[in-house]
Amino acid sequence: MQLVAALAALGALVAPAVAYPHAPMNETLVDVQLTAIGNTMIKAIITNKGDTPLNMLQFNTIMDENPNRKVMVFKDGWHIPLLYFVNRFFTTLAPQASVEHSFDIAATHDLSVGGKYVVTANGAIPTAEEHSTTITSAALYESNELQMDIDGNQAAAVEQAMNFTPEMQSIHARALEKRTKIVGGSCNANTLRATQTALGNSARLAQAAARAAAQNPQKFQEYFRTNDANAKQRVIARLNSVARESSSANAGVTTYYCSDTMGGCKPRVLAYTLPSRNLVVNCPIYYNLPPLTRQCHAQDQATTTLHEFTHNPAVASPHCQDYAYGYQQCISLPAAKAVQNADNYALFANGMF
């Protein structure tokens, strides 16, 4: 993922989210308004505009307490990348009721330059009926556009959400100098072997998926909600880039860690990516997955790695976001978001092959 969540490992609370009846996304159910309450502090007001209570999933949405992508931050028209990501529960919201959530964008974005920024929020919140954890739909939202004038020095003083230590920066720099993908010091024999196997499988899946995208319009429509020629070329190019990046364990544009030293591996997280550094980290439960599943739309190490590579801008730009997880939610996305959603690529590769 900008975190991949291990849905199957969540138990009764949210396990039903893995498979639920196909329901289109609702574009009018939820309203999100942003206001500035400090130099880099933002308050988001999320309102249920419907006439029935909603049980709204917090994980990897604007309501998540962890450092996921809550908003998009722009300066002079350029997107400021998220430095990291992350965990999960539900919030029940009565009809016309609102919930407020405040967060500091300087904890997850580098705003040290200061000046004028534009902040927006958009995405999808999986929803269930009141007193239920069975996902039945998802509410798309797009907030107002918030203009902020930020003091760079104050922003730089905000504690970062993840511990990217000087030692880690040094390791990362050495890895880039040598064009090393897997950082050997982060692996033991078992995790190194598993990661190398996942890379090989990811390469084969991505190559096969790229061919299928060109040759199977029915399946392309199923997973990406369009057969537009430009969208198809974008998907094929991204899959080919993932295949190239996965094809070697000692050369490439990303740095790959077998283990986490930055504190991003929260409960239920399989792996995560830092797009600003083109860095991928496997979490302990990644190694509980099978190397390559035979079950359609199930999680495995290969498609988790494929998913993570789509988040890296050095692999393909613009890099993918996490708008939705799981087959039913992903195929409910509109085409523009499906083509930019990481899990659509992993599911397409797995579902075809």
UniProtKB/Swiss-Prot annotation:
Signal peptide range: 1-19
GO cellular component: extracellular region
Record InterPro entries: Fungal_M35_metalloproteases (IPR050414), MetalloPept_cat_dom_sf (IPR024079), Peptidase_M35 (IPR001384)
Catalytic activity: Preferential cleavage of bonds with hydrophobic residues in P1'. Also 3-Asn-|-Gln-4 and 8-Gly-|-Ser-9 bonds in insulin B chain
GO terms of molecular function: metal ion binding; metalloendopeptidase activity
Family: Belongs to the peptidase M35 family.
Short name of any one Pfam family annotated for the protein: Peptidase_M35
Task of the protein: Probable secreted metalloprotease that shows high activities on basic nuclear substrates such as histone and protamine. May be involved in virulence.
GO terms, biological process: proteolysis
Residues annotated as binding Zn(2+): 307, 311, 322
Name listed for the protein in its UniProt record: Probable neutral protease 2 homolog MCYG_07155
Positions of the catalytic residues: 308
Enzyme class: hydrolase
Subcellular location: Secreted
UniProt EC number: 3.4.24.39
The keyword Translocase belongs to this UniProt entry's keyword annotation: no
